[in-house]
From Swiss-Prot:
The keyword Nucleotide-binding applies. One of its GO terms (molecular function) is ATP binding. This is GMP synthase [glutamine-hydrolyzing]. Catalyzes the synthesis of GMP from XMP. Homodimer. The active site is at residues 87, 174, 176. Pathway: Purine metabolism; GMP biosynthesis; GMP from XMP (L-Gln route): step 1/1. Its EC number is 6.3.5.2. Keywords: ATP-binding, Glutamine amidotransferase, GMP biosynthesis, Ligase, Nucleotide-binding, Purine biosynthesis. It comes from Bacillus thuringiensis subsp. konkukian (strain 97-27). The keyword Repeat does not apply. One of its GO terms (cellular component) is cytosol. Residues 201-390 form the GMPS ATP-PPase domain.
Length: 515
């Protein structure tokens, strides 16, 4: 994690394993206050040395009374800093100060109506009733001495508590998740009202620190960048090029799993436009041979991840003095792959599947940023809007949008249908409103009628979501007439397709990608 100059107020977030923990730091950064995420094992002395204005305990999947329960250094409570416990964090605080935590009769997951009973600083200027996001299996059933109930819900009699004399606060819900109506306001109240923070952190600070960090890390050595043309790798390439210039060599691997026209566009933009040293590797046949007969999504991800590294290894052996490999790993990549305390959802192409004998040191300058921050960073670096606002695209490419075994025919269906979707979304003026949209091929066939003849062809799925950072997402309400145009065009213009379906599932419970 980047350590910024000490004139910037900082809030420390302790990680107890919640899949939402990075969101807490992200929300605080949105307010112009720097926030760092640290493991729950950090010591009180280490925190004291950082001179933070306050501490937040994240949620987590464990029970405070269960085997393997996660705890923190008890001396943290003696630092005199404001502490805000969220979900598991509140339960841990309760246990620490002698309260009672018990298993709930049933797990509560989803939206709930919160009723504010005591207007502590945390609830200042907030409505008495508000919708919040619950995700817990345990409850605080007995308050610690000196604490009062701040809020309740139908299934949670102690949904919020505080000891304002000691600046200790806890909530059973997740204010960092956007489903909580006034979650941002509540976190703001803690950051500014309780901790007394001032704004002072922005992307200019990040660029200044990261450029210095890259130069210090790399020195006079050389860096290979895995350039795909997507937002993440593009920003990484430009940022590193700004830091070290010609010490950077970009390798663009055409693995045959790219979107329509993407390979040509990448070379034109970066080789000609940004005057970078870009080596194009045609590895279509190599990847397809490795993926032949493979259906399991995790295995596909691992194969694609491994093959990328092997390709870079091959190319690096042709070059002299290549020591570092740059990747566009984001915060969301790391959280979805699981941390030391989080439960793994799925391996990610930027953090999973790397061979143990990899010959490069990794450099990941974006691994503290969320997608929306990367776009801001890209704009600050002077990258054109058409790149900064390009659709998010996973490292495995269309390989995880073809469910099951990958074939050239299936890739062509996804490639052509996706191009139509992107074209129509742009025509409708929705390309900036919808966070991510793409087509996927679930591998199922269905009966249809075309030209008075029976068909038995593929179904194409359309996925479109609205989001801020990719941690949570809602399905996009695309107008029916736009969906109709997309459907008609795909069925008529893409061979072997006779049916279109639209995915109306949010994240959670689903992930954005289908594999």
């Amino acid at each position: 994690m980047i350590i910024l100059k000490k004139q910037h107020d900082t809030i420390i977030v302790l990680d107890f394993g919640s899949q939402y923990n990075q969101l807490i730091a992200r929300r605080i950064r949105e307010f112009g206050v720097y926030s760092e995420l640290h493991p729950h094992t950090i010591t009180a002395e280490e925190i004291k040395a950082m001179n933070p204005k306050g501490i937040i305990f994240s949620g987590g999947p464990n029970s405070v009374y269960g085997e393997g329960a996660l705890h923190c250094d008890e001396k943290i409570f003696d630092l005199g800093l404001p502490i805000f416990g969220i979900c598991y964090g509140m339960q841990l605080m309760t246990q620490q100060f002698g309260g009672t935590v018990e298993r709930a009769n049933h797990r509560e997951y989803g939206k709930a109506v919160l009723k504010v009973e005591n207007e502590s600083k945390l609830y200042a200027n907030l409505p008495e009733e508000q919708v919040v996001w619950m995700s817990h299996g345990d409850l605080v059933t007995g308050l610690p001495e000196g604490f009062v109930v701040d809020a309740t819900s139908e299934s949670c009699p102690i949904a919020g508590m505080s000891n304002e004399a000691k600046n200790l606060y806890g909530v059973q819900f997740h204010p960092e998740v956007r489903h909580s109506e006034h979650g941002n306001d509540l976190i703001k109240n803690f950051v500014f009202g309780v901790c007394g923070c001032s704004e002072g952190w922005n992307m200019e600070n990040f660029i200044e620190v990261e450029l210095e960090k890259i130069r210090e890390t790399v020195g006079d050595k050389k860096v290979l960048c895995a350039l795909s043309g997507g937002v993440d790798s593009s920003v990484v390439a430009v940022l590193i090029h700004k830091a070290i210039g010609d010490q950077l060599t970009c390798i663009f691997v055409d693995h045959g799993l790219l979107r329509k026209g993407e390979a040509e566009g990448v070379m034109k933009t970066f080789s000609e436009g940004f005057h970078m040293n870009v080596i194009k590797v045609d590895a279509k046949e190599r990847f397809m041979n490795k993926l032949k007969g493979v259906e399991d999504p995790e295995q596909k991800r691992k194969i694609i991840g491994n093959e990328f590294i092997y390709v870079f290894d091959d190319e690096a052996s042709k070059l002299e003095g290549m020591d570092f490999l740059a990747q566009g790993t984001l915060y969301t990549d790391i959280v979805e792959s699981g941390t030391a305390t989080a439960q793994t959802i799925k391996s990610h192409h930027n953090v999973g599947g790397l061979p143990e004998d990899m010959q490069f040191k990794l450099i990941e300058p974006l691994n503290t940023l969320f997608k929306d921050e990367v776009r801001v960073l890209g704009s600050e670096l002077g990258i054109p809007d058409e790149i900064v606002w390009r659709q998010p695209f996973p490292g495995p490419g269309l390989g995880i949008r073809v469910l099951g075994e990958i074939t050239e025919e299936k890739l062509e269906i996804v490639r052509e249908s996706d191009a139509i979707l992107r074209e129509e979304i742009t025509k409708a003026g929705l390309d900036r409103e919808i966070w991510q949209y793409f087509t996927a091929l679930p591998g199922m066939r269905s009966v249809g009628v075309m030209g008075d003849e029976r068909t038995y062809d593929y179904t194409v799925g359309i996925r479109a979501v609205t989001s801020i950072d990719g941690m949570t997402a809602d399905w996009a309400r695309i107008p029916w007439d736009v969906l109709e145009k997309i459907s008609v065009r795909i069925v008529n213009e893409v061979k072997h397709v006779n049916r279109i379906v639209y995915d109306v599932t949010s994240k959670p419970p689903a992930t954005i990608e289908w594999e």
